[in-house]
Amino acid sequence: MKTNDGKSVDVGKVWWFWFSSNAFAVDKRLRRLFRMLPHDPRCKFCNAPFQGVGGIVVRALFGKQRSDLNPLFCNLCEMASREFPGGAEVEMSMLFADVRGSTALSKKMRPTEFSQLINRFYSGSTNLISKEDGLVEKLAGDAVAAFWGAGFAGPNYVRRTIKVAQNLSNVMARQGIPVGIGVHSGVAFFGAVGTADGLTNISAIGDEVNTAARLASKAAAGEIIVSEQALKAADIDGSELESRSLELKGISEPVLVRVMRGKQ
């Protein structure tokens, strides 16, 4: 395809290098810098804050502000996603976490109390994910999804994903929030997907992503279900952890997993 200035570009290579290569270390440093600035809400992609003192700083120094077309992104990230529609198949790790028994909890609590619980879950999750250079893919209902790649988190990105899972399990347990977590790794499509009217989202899709989500659905409160595939990629010996063979919807073969419970 051609960019807006008429230059030819291989979109797949752009997304692959951005997500998988350390060539974009400056982007990683900026994401960390933006995360240190107050205040939420933020750009889903670069962590630039939209409001408060942090919002004023990034508007003045970087020209970033909330996009008029997509409130999840800053104007510059949204523009880049439209300029490079498409993506690439990349190696990544995925974390899905959700509040177990949320329907029953919502019936026991006042709406305001339940909303505060979910907000604590969102806040704790996003802080831990961002500190380990993960991309928060979505916050929806009672669930959080995030992804890691070498371009963001370095060669130990799978190990960092598992670290977040352990820390998140511990933090939520201390707050009395019952959370189950699934971690997996593999190849998925990562890039900008959009609609005919120009609205874009930056996401990861594919069978491996679906597997991670289904692992989370099998995790009881306080459990972290990690696929053997992810443990191998992280070079972690899981031989002393509980082993399970799970039948997952849409997956023809049983998936071998290990079960963690907070920090090991």
Language-model features: locations:
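Regulatory cytosolic signal-relay segments
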Residues: M1-V90
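Alpha-helix/helix-capping structural signal
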Residues: R100, V187-A188, N210, Q229
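Catalytic core of nucleotidyl cyclases, primarily class III adenylyl/guanylyl cyclases
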Residues: T126-R160, V171-D207, V255-R258
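Cytosolic regulatory/linker segments at or just downstream of nucleotide-handling modules
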Residues: K218-Q264
